[in-house]
From Swiss-Prot:
Keyword tags: Lyase, Molybdenum cofactor biosynthesis
UniProt organism field: Methylococcus capsulatus (strain ATCC 33009 / NCIMB 11132 / Bath)
The protein's annotated pathway: Cofactor biosynthesis; molybdopterin biosynthesis
SUPFAM superfamilies tied to this protein: Molybdenum cofactor biosynthesis protein C, MoaC
Listed EC numbers: 4.6.1.17
Top-tier EC class: lyase
Upper lineage: Bacteria, Pseudomonadati, Pseudomonadota, Gammaproteobacteria, Methylococcales
PANTHER family reported for this sequence: MOLYBDOPTERIN COFACTOR SYNTHESIS PROTEIN A
Function: Catalyzes the conversion of (8S)-3',8-cyclo-7,8-dihydroguanosine 5'-triphosphate to cyclic pyranopterin monophosphate (cPMP).
Protein name as annotated: Cyclic pyranopterin monophosphate synthase
Pfam family membership, one: MoaC
Record: residues binding substrate: L75, C76, H77, M113, E114
Active site location: D128
InterPro entries, per the entry: MoaC, MoaC_bact/euk, MoaC_sf, MoCo_biosynth_MoaA/MoaC, Mopterin_CF_biosynth-C_dom
Cystine bridges: none
Amino acid sequence: MPELTHFNTAGDAHMVDVGGKPSTTRMAVAEGYIAMLPETLRLIMAGGHEKGDVLGIARIAGIMGAKRTADLIPLCHPIPITHVDLALEPQPEASRIRCRTTVQTVGQTGVEMEALTATQIALLTIYDMCKAVDRGMSIESVRLLEKIGGKSGHWQRASGEARSSTR
């Protein structure tokens, strides 16, 4: 089993030194869902929510979340993000919205945490904007789908795989 990199030999938490690593192009894709009542999804899709464009605001919030990841997760490096693509896809047949986020950088460490954070923040924003009409919404299956770049190269979740034990 690989070692946890955020602990030193004494077992203390530390920020990993990436200074000696070469800058390379890196990309990560994450997804997650928010399940809700069919009426809530219809309200969002019709654009009739009194607070405004739920999906548009959630998209901007997710992008902001990607940019603020290092402020939220203590041992994350602040990195120069070169691109964030966040898509929100209503899925009426499942009464949910899928969020898929792609984040890119050219740097010394990956953008997995930025993609996961952006996804979570977008979904949390939908929850916040709609909780007055549906407190039973559920954020589900937030996970990394793919990462490219760095020492570990290319990793992609197998189709239908809920959990991965590989790097």
